[in-house]
From Swiss-Prot:
Topology in the lipid bilayer: Peripheral membrane protein
Keyword Repressor: no
Its biological purpose: F(1)F(0) ATP synthase produces ATP from ADP in the presence of a proton or sodium gradient. F-type ATPases consist of two structural domains, F(1) containing the extramembraneous catalytic core and F(0) containing the membrane proton channel, linked together by a central stalk and a peripheral stalk. During catalysis, ATP synthesis in the catalytic domain of F(1) is coupled via a rotary mechanism of the central stalk subunits to proton translocation. This protein is part of the stalk that links CF(0) to CF(1). It either transmits conformational changes from CF(0) to CF(1) or is implicated in proton conduction.
Principal location class: membrane
Gene Ontology molecular-function annotations: proton-transporting ATP synthase activity, rotational mechanism
Organism the protein comes from: Alkaliphilus oremlandii (strain OhILAs)
The protein's name in its UniProt record: ATP synthase subunit delta
InterPro entries: ATP_synth_OSCP/delta_N_sf, ATPase_OSCP/d_CS, ATPase_OSCP/dsu
Xref: Gene3D superfamilies: N-terminal domain of the delta subunit of the F1F0-ATP synthase (1.10.520.20)
Protein localization: Cell membrane
């Protein structure tokens, strides 16, 4: 249910923002709101609290974000509060960002390596992945020494495993079949 609610609210806001050519600005402002919620868990708990009235929550939101976000985002937050959907704010923001990214053909990806990648190597891998996938890949590097060497790339739900660890496991499996 949470996913359905989040998608509905995100889609409604996206349609409004896209019509007014504000979808990028709204995305930035929603990301800011999400970071505020993540940085201050007590703030999120306050928003979800049934002990605080909707009007009090809207006053709090207004005092914090009035000068930092556009009226569309502020009104959207008011609607979320009026409908009792405060617990879904982070999920709604995540869904909204996915909608904007899909319009831009943008996909987040992770390159996992045993040691940090050089910036130029990361950019070259990003360019190659973008070219082969036809999408605007946004590549981040994560370090995991257990993969020994090579690179493991995760693009959405796809995995490209070019690690030494995987090659050794494959060789071990093939050798065990031969020896049995």
């Amino acid at each position: 249910m949470a996913e359905l609610v989040s998608k509905r609210y995100a889609s409604a806001l996206f349609e409004l923002a896209f019509e007014e050519q504000k979808h990028h600005k709204v995305q930035e402002e929603l990301a800011f709101i999400r970071s505020c919620i993540e940085d201050e868990p007590s703030f999120f708990e306050l928003l979800k609290s049934p002990l605080i009235t909707a009007d009090e929550k809207k006053d709090i939101i207004s005092n914090i974000f009035r000068d930092r976000v556009c009226m569309e985002v502020l009104n959207f937050l008011y609607i979320i509060i009026d409908k009792g959907r405060e617990a879904y704010i982070k999920d709604i923001v995540n869904e909204y960002i996915l909608l904007v990214d899909s319009v831009q053909n943008k996909v987040d990806a992770v390159a996992i390596t045993a040691v940090p990648m050089e910036k130029q190597d990361l950019l070259m891998l990003q360019a190659n992945l973008s070219k082969s996938s036809g999408k605007n890949i946004q590549l981040q590097n994560q370090v995991d020494p257990t993969i020994i060497g090579g690179v493991l790339v995760k693009i959405g739900d796809k995995v490209i495993d070019g690690t030494i660890k995987n090659r050794l496991a494959t060789m071990q499996e093939q050798l065990s079949k031969i020896l049995v």
